[in-house]
Amino acid sequence: GKARLIQNLLAVVDELELALNAAKNTEGAGAVANGLEIVLKKFRDLLSGEGLTTIESVGKKFDPTLHEAVERIQCDDVAEGTILEEVRKGFTLKGKLIRPSIVKIAVPHIPESDDAKPIESGQN
């Protein structure tokens, strides 16, 4: 149905975003980047009009119903479970999850304890 079509269109949006980022980092590709931005905006507007909403992730608390964690990064600057980076955007369609955000989350730094070091037996 409609959800499947939108999921397929999201794959196209992902590819367009990758192409746009590549064009922005390529000297002399300004016109290509501008064209891609226009196409992406039209895609996003069309999908938004159908009820698609981007899930806000970075800086938010990890929610397993909306996010999929692919990496845990030791970080003491933010609360445990805070999303540090979004690898792929997630979306809801009229309030229902259509694609989870793929994210990297903060975990507390674990200091190495003396227990973790090998025990020396004293024998040679």
What spans do the regions from the language model cover?
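Structured alpha/beta interaction-core segments
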Residues: V13-N124
